[in-house]
């Protein structure tokens, strides 16, 4: 029962944290609020203790979030920015592990070289979810955010694989060689991507088979979709591949496979609402768990530091600042180098970095905040070596990693709004143009389809529909579509007409809903009739609201 009540309390806290941030007279990013509430609940006064199992955390929370990110990631843009993304997610991770690893070994007494590499490895993954939480959706220009999100999807795997190598060397179960590490990394990465693709493809085939046999019940399909992401992760991990990349690949494959495009309307609507709820809860749980671990990490690390003659307690806090500053310097230097290389050697097909200003490079550097993967990775470091001795400097690694996570979030909260203040984003203007173009293009196609249907119905003797009625209905529908096409020339008027029509329809639907409840209250209709008609109205209203 204790676990059950703990889950209920955490879910309640996640739900209320959003309300708290809106009620406060000053603005606090939601992730920081959830971390603060978690730390407060775990303080000895309240005593909510949650045992953090890194392996369970990686299986339970990370696959759904990465699957959802992969699902939402536009594949075309991801491929177009492939050089930039892999330059950050692979090459920069290697540079970070080597460079920051030697720095940690040099500035932090008591941390041997291999554990220093392990700490640098867990500090290399960035967290796009935390970034969106501290700056808000759409605040960072799309050209930057798209690359940062792609980087975050990929560098989780590269960082954890680097950690695995470092821990294996420290445990004495592996002799590190560059060639061996490269082959192992390629095997883990490519195998994970293939595993995610195959599992997702099999899911798509099975959904088509079930639909053919009448098994297109939305609830069943959503549950199977939810199980898909765990299946891709667990199968890949069982084989020895990257489960993280498998979850990402499965999410991206779903968008390209056409499964959602051909799914029933009810399934698409329910899937979107279900995933929105799960993302909110899982994201909140991640930051809440981070906060719940902080008091224990702080107290145990300080006690261990006091007992360690080689460590000055106050220097641990200084080391956090120095390590974070070094991470930002390496990141900025790498971005600046890629910009120069693009301008010098890739003039025919330059990378996106080639046109970035120094301010945009700074934004991308500070935006590389650390989050859940870093904490889970560092806590997964074993307590003991095979010979029974304690893993070298484990408490220091955990303390420094947790400190860098928090410090990166605080710096992001303060610095990013300042850096973004003078950045004029034209993303919304471009999006409005694309929307108008798409609406007009789809209206043209729709008009042709209606005209063909009118001709088919008029020639169908079985339907036996009056030609005048056919013409009247088709003309009314085509008239609405014509206004959308004409909107290319008079955009504001067209958008105003669509907005007014939507508002009128919503008002009508809501009044109909109220009347249905009245009819049920006066016992003029049964509860079954009420539920059926309410379901129809909900679908229509969802379509109108989705179109806003």
Predicted regions and their residues:
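Transmembrane helical cores of multi-pass secondary ion antiporters/exchangers
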Residues: 1-434, 516-536, 540-548
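Cytosolic C-terminal regulatory domains/tails of membrane transporters and channels
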Residues: 428-548
């Amino acid at each position: 029962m204790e676990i059950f009540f703990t889950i209920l309390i955490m879910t309640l806290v996640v739900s209320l944290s959003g309300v708290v941030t809106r009620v406060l007279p000053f603005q606090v990013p939601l992730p920081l609020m959830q971390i603060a509430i978690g730390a407060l609940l775990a303080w000895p006064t309240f005593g909510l203790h949650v045992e953090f199992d890194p392996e369970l955390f990686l299986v339970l929370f990370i696959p759904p979030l990465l699957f959802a990110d992969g699902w939402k990631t536009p594949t075309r843009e991801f491929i177009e920015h492939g050089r930039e993304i892999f330059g950050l997610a692979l090459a920069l991770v290697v540079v970070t592990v080597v460079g920051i690893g030697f720095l940690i070994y040099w500035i932090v007494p008591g941390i041997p070289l291999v554990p220093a590499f392990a700490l640098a490895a867990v500090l290399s993954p960035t967290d796009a979810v935390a970034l969106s939480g501290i700056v808000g959706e759409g605040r960072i220009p799309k050209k930057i955010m798209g690359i940062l999100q792609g980087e975050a999807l990929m560098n989780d795997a590269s960082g954890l694989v680097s950690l695995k190598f470092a821990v294996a060397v420290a445990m004495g179960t592996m002799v590190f060689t560059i060639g061996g590490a490269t082959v192992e990394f390629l095997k883990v990465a490519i195998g994970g991507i293939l595993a995610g693709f195959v599992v997702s493809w099999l899911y798509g085939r099975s959904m088509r088979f079930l639909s053919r046999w009448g098994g297109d019940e939305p609830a069943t399909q959503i549950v199977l979709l939810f199980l898909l992401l765990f299946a891709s992760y667990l199968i890949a991990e069982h084989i020895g591949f990257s489960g993280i990349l498998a979850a990402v690949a499965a999410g991206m494959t779903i968008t390209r496979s056409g499964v959602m495009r051909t799914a029933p309307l009810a399934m698409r609507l329910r899937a979107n609402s279900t995933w929105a709820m799960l993302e909110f809860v899982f994201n909140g749980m991640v930051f809440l768990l981070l906060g719940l671990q902080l008091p224990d990490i702080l107290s145990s690390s300080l006690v261990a530091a006091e007992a360690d003659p080689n460590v000055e307690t106050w220097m641990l806090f200084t080391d956090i600042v120095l390590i974070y500053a070094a991470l930002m310097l390496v990141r900025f230097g790498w971005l600046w180098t890629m910009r120069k290389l693009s301008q010098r050697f890739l003039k025919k097909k330059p990378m996106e970095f080639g046109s970035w200003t120094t301010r945009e490079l700074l934004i991308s550097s500070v935006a590389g905040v650390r989050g859940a993967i870093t904490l889970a990775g560092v806590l997964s470091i074993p307590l003991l070596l095979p010979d029974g001795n304690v893993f070298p400097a484990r408490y220091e690694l955990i303390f420094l990693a947790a400190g860098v996570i928090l410090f990166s979030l605080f710096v992001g909260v303060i610095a990013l709004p300042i850096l973004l203040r003078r950045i004029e984003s034209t993303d919304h203007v471009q999006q409005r143009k694309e929307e108008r173009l798409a609406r007009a293009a789809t209206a043209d196609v729709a008009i042709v389809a209606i005209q063909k249907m009118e001709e088919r119905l008029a020639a169908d003797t079985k339907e036996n529909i009056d030609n005048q009625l056919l013409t009247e209905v088709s003309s009314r529908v085509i008239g609405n579509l014509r206004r959308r096409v004409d909107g290319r020339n008079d955009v504001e008027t067209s958008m105003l007409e669509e907005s007014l029509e939507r508002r009128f329809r919503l008002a009508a639907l809501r009044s109909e809903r109220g009347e249905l409840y009245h009819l049920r209250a006066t016992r003029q209709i049964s509860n079954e009739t009420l539920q059926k008609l309410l379901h129809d109205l909900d679908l229509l209203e969802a379509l109108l609201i989705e179109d806003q």
